């Protein structure tokens, strides 16, 4: 850089800064903010403005929301076992030594149930929580689901004063809405950060390698130790569970891109965690890719859908005869496989739609899948399986050439 140009720009900046200061000073004197006499007069500023609530109306200030909800946010300490290392980059969980980790959570009800992330308590021999200035108490891990990264803890309500935080409706969240995160980043308890909902319907990786759909993206600062804490709307209701951050390739701290698990997903899994201690997810057993620029020139029969890349051995998809491709393009896309365009009557525009289409199903349910094999549109009915604990290793690629061309449904079924 030309040092003279740089110096000149600094001089201009300084001159402008001095001019602004003079003008601003004149304004402050004229308005009475600055007194030129011996006595200094300080005017009281405007009261804090309320932030816009999740439904667009004026709501409480951030301070009011913090004072109303902070007592319901828990500081979680997990020790023993394999705690202290996140299985996926971006999970904001700091190690605090061998087999020890910390995180956040929040009171769900007066019965003693607490929500947090599964990766915060995974493998722990002992989990303790502390609300505000109360004593730390031991809690039971009632259940955990690595596929959604949600864990449900249970504390004796007689041993701690609980201040449940009301749950919102994540389906009503809109981009630009107020977002407030409360938690314990780097062990700094009672920390509140604010921002907005930056984007919706993000797909993030769960600790077991499966995808979590419809995650909420926010620029409210989320750091290691925030995991499991609440993401609140402008009315102080929980719209998400803070779970992951984009680190920017090396940094352990926030770069303004954080992700929260939608609270509506938590509402769906809580009953199973209470009853069974685990969640049974429906499973097809395919890995798919979108129809994008990388598929140009392949002459696909549709411009939307989920292109099958891999079929897990012994999965419902494999048993039904769905096929993956055999040829890999320069972009790494596997072509020549089936193109899924509809699942259980729901149109498939992109791969995440497949998971969304079966989200409300359970293992054992039977669904119809419409797909193209070459130019021919076909339909197969399969019985959904139970999702394995971790994503199966790829390598099936589907049927071998000498296998039958037609998929084999379990038995005749009335198509939707």
Region spans (language model):
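Conserved catalytic motifs of ABC-family nucleotide-binding domains
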Residues: 337
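Serine-dependent protease modules
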Residues: 3-304, 309-313, 332, 343-346, ...
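Short, exposed coil/turn segments at beta-strand boundaries within extracellular/luminal domains
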Residues: 375-377
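Surface-exposed intrinsically disordered loops and tails
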Residues: 326-330
């Amino acid at each position: 850089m030309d040092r003279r140009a740089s110096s000149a720009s600094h001089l201009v900046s300084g001159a402008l800064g001095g001019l602004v200061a003079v003008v601003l000073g004149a304004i402050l004197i004229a308005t009475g903010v600055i007194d030129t006499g011996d006595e200094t007069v300080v005017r009281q500023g405007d009261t804090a403005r309320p932030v816009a609530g999740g439904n667009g109306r004026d709501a409480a200030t951030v301070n009011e929301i913090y004072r109303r909800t902070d007592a319901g946010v828990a500081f979680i300490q997990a020790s023993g076992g394999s705690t202290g290392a996140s299985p996926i980059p971006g999970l904001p969980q700091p190690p605090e030594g061998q087999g020890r980790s910390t995180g956040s959570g929040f009171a769900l009800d007066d019965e003693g149930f607490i929500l947090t992330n599964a990766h915060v308590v995974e493998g722990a021999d002992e989990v303790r929580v502390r609300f505000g200035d109360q004593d730390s108490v031991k809690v039971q891990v009632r259940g955990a689901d690595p596929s959604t990264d949600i864990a449900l803890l249970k504390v004796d309500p007689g041993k701690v004063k609980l201040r449940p935080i009301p749950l919102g409706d994540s389906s009503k969240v809109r981009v630009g809405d107020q977002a407030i995160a409360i938690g314990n980043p780097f062990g700094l308890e009672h920390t509140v950060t604010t921002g907005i909902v930056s984007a919706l319907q993000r797909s993030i990786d769960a600790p077991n390698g499966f995808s979590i759909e419809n995650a909420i993206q926010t620029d409210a600062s989320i750091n290691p130790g925030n995991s499991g804490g609440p993401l609140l709307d402008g009315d102080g209701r929980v719209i998400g569970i803070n779970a992951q951050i984009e680190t920017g390739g090396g940094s352990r701290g926030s770069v303004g891109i954080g992700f929260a698990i939608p609270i509506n997903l938590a509402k769906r899994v809580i009953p199973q965690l209470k009853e069974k201690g685990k969640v049974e997810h429906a499973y097809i057993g395919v890995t798919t890719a979108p129809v994008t620029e990388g598929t140009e020139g392949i002459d696909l029969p549709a411009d939307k859908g989920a292109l099958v890349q891999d079929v897990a051995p012994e999965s419902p998809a494999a048993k039904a005869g769905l096929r993956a491709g055999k040829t890999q393009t320069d972009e790494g896309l596997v072509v020549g496989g089936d193109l899924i365009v509809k699942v259980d009557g729901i149109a498939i525009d992109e791969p995440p739609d497949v998971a969304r289409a079966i989200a409300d199903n359970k293992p054992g349910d039977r669904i119809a899948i419409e797909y193209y094999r070459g130019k021919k549109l076909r339909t197969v009915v399969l019985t959904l399986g139970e999702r394995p604990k971790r994503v199966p290793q790829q390598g099936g690629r589907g049927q071998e050439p000498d296998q039958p061309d037609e998929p084999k449904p379990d038995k005749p079924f009335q198509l939707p």
